[in-house]
Amino acid sequence: MERKTVLVIADLGGCPPHMFYESAAEKYNLVSFIPRPFAITASHAALIEKYSIAVIKDKDYFKSLADFEHPDSIYWAHEDHDKPEEEVVEEIVKVADMFAVDAITTNNELFIAPMAKACKRLGLRGAGVQAAENARDKNKMRAAFNRAGVKSIKNKRVTTLEDFRAALQEIGTPLILKPTYLASSIGVTLIKEMETAEAEFNRVNEYLKSINVPKAVTFEAPFIAEEFLQGEYDDWYETSGYSDYISIEGIMADGEYFPVAIHDKTPQIGFTETAHITPSILDDDAKRKIVEAAKKANEGLGLENCATHTEIKLMKNREAGLIESAPRFAGWNMIPNIKKVFGVDMAQLLLDVLCFGKEADLPKGLLEQEPCYVADCHLYPQHFKENGQLPETVVDFVIESIEIPDGVLKGDTELVSFSAAEAGTSVDLRLFEAFNSIAAFELKGSNSNDVAESIKQIQQQAKLTAKYALSV
C-alpha cells in the first residue's frame, strides 16, 4: 500500500517528540510545518529533520543567524506570534496543498482551531470547526458539557473585575478561576475567601499579561469562573497514595468516542500535576462511570476525528465531574507509557483515523491491564519546601544538585530514568509552579500501590543542594 502523507504542525505539547516522530514516520510520510521556530528545542528540531520528508519554517521569524538556533529546553514560548487566525489557516492550507497531504495533525493545543478550519477547507478529516472552538474556549466547553448530560456546574464568563464580582455573588466560594485559552493549568486559581478574592483576580490577570500566546488564539472572554468540583477520594479508591481526579485518553473517529486508557494521579501542588501512573487501579464500576462521562463530554463537544485528553474529578457517590477535555494528546510521557504498558501506539492510531476513519484498528473498550505499571513524575520546588530543604520564604534559588537517595523504592519498583536541572540553573518561585519542574523521573513496577508509595518517598527524601538568599 502506498504510504500516505501527513502534515504535522510542529510546536510544543502533546505526545513528546521522542515518540511521536519515529512512530508516525514508521507508517507515514511526514511533512513538518513550523509556524513558531522559536518554540522548537534543539532535540525536537533534530527529530523533525530526521523523520520528515520535508520541513517548512515560517520565514517571517528569521531576521538574523541567531534565529536559526534552538534552545536546549523550553516549557512555554514567550516570543510573539502575531499572525491572525485566518493568516495561519492560509499558511497551513498552502503547505498542505504543496505536498498533497492526506491528513493534518498537531500536538499543540494553541493551533487546534486554525488546523480544524484548514482541514475543513481541504476536505480532510479533523476535529471539526465548531467542535475545535468549543474545546479551545473553556466557556464554550463548559456550556457544551452542561448540555451533554454530565454533571452541570455553575459558571460565568469573566472579562473585567466587575464580571468577577458578579461571578462571586452568583457562585460563591470556593470558586475556580481559569484562563479560557491556556493549557497546563497555567493561571488556574482556587478562590477560597471573599476577602482576598479581588486581590487574587487582579494578581492573576496581571500575571497573564506576561504569558504570550499566538494572535490566532481567539476567545470571547479571557476567564471562566466555575463552581469548585469537590472530590471524594474514599468513594473511589481503597488505598491511599493517589489523587481525587484522573485523566482518560481516547480517540474520536467520525464523531464516535473510543476510550483507550485511564491514568491515576498522585496529589497535586495546587493545580500542578506531579505524577501519572499508567494504567489505573480503579475497579470496573469506576472505570465504566469515567468512560460514560468522557463519552458524553467529547461527543457533546461535537468532536469528529482527533485524539482526546479528558480530566475528570472523582466526586461523592462516584459521580464523575468533568474538569475539561482537549482534542489533542496528553502531555508528559502519558502517550509513550500507554505504548510501554499495552503495546498500543496512539500516535499511529490517530494518523490511521485521520487517513482511514473507522477502518483504523480502533480499541473495543479500555485496553486490558498488563501486569506492569509505569509512572511519569516531576519534582517541583514545593516538594523541597514540604520536606524542609527550602525555606518557605525563598523566592528564588540556584540549583547545585538534585539526587534520589538509595532505599526509597518499594517492592519491585524500579527507577527507569532520572534527570534534573543542570547545576547553575536559576529558579524563580514567583512563576506558576507548572513552569518550575526541576527534576523528572520514571518508575516501573508490578504493584501500583508500591509505585505510588515510591513516588511519595522520593518527594519526601530527594536531596536538593541549592544556593539562596533570604529576605531580611
UniProtKB/Swiss-Prot annotation:
Residues 142-355 form the ATP-grasp domain. Keywords: Antibiotic biosynthesis, ATP-binding, Ligase, Magnesium, Metal-binding, Nucleotide-binding. It is an enzyme of class 6 (ligase). Its EC number is 6.3.2.49. Its cofactor is Mg(2+). Pfam families: ATP-grasp_4. GO terms for biological process: antibiotic biosynthetic process. Transmembrane segments: none annotated. Substrate binds at residues 273, 309-311, 328-331. Binds 2 Mg(2+) ions per monomer. The record marks 332 as: Plays a key role in restricting the N-terminal substrate specificity to small amino acids such as L-Ala. Mg(2+) 1 binds at residues 109, 182, 324. One of its GO terms (molecular function) is metal ion binding. It catalyses: L-anticapsin + L-alanine + ATP = bacilysin + ADP + phosphate + H(+). InterPro entries: ATP-dep_AA_Ligase (IPR052032), ATP-grasp (IPR011761), ATP_grasp_subdomain_1 (IPR013815). ATP binds at residues 138, 178, 184-185, 226-229, 268. Pathway: Antibiotic biosynthesis; bacilysin biosynthesis. Mg(2+) 2 binds at residues 311, 324. Monomer or homodimer. Part of the bacABCDEFG operon responsible for the biosynthesis of bacilysin, an irreversible inactivator of the glutaminase domain of glucosamine synthetase. Catalyzes the formation of alpha-dipeptides from various L-amino acids in the presence of ATP. In vivo catalyzes the ligation of L-alanine and L-anticapsin (epoxycyclohexanonyl-Ala) to produce the final bacilysin antibiotic (L-Ala-L-4S-cyclohexenonyl-Ala dipeptide). This is Alanine--anticapsin ligase. It comes from Bacillus amyloliquefaciens.
